């Protein structure tokens, strides 16, 4: 994809919802393309945002969080929209939440400097990608979820071979019986918390 231009970015088939056979155009030329939601010119599924509703929702949710002394990190994986990430951050969000290191990289390229990965990061390629992002972007803060000692050992094993890798910031994920992820029992959570605290990774 071309280098970003925040004032008049180039849009093209690499973006969700852009006609795959159409030539790239600048945002300023988008309206001249004559595409309509009703004439099947745009691929589905497609989300359409009303500016007034978006502005209202951003204000409302940020106010809701602030009144409760909460930091908000809205989930970016659904939209994968750098423009929306910036709007959320400008409205006061602490950071943006992603599900994968790939999604995080898109956010970082768009200027996100605080993020959560709401997932367990443990594969060598993902750990290497995260370490590279942290090394290349001074001040970047990212935390990911850990829900087992086994995952922690995988992270430690990778880091033992990567002496220059930064120490990772993690959050202990609590789960519920029958849930998909997270530590299920109090004793297990305490044991994992102690292991995380003692870990060099």
Predicted regions span which residues?
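A charged N-terminal "starter" segment
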Residues: 1-132
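Active-site-proximal beta-alpha core segment in soluble small-molecule metabolic enzymes
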Residues: 73-200
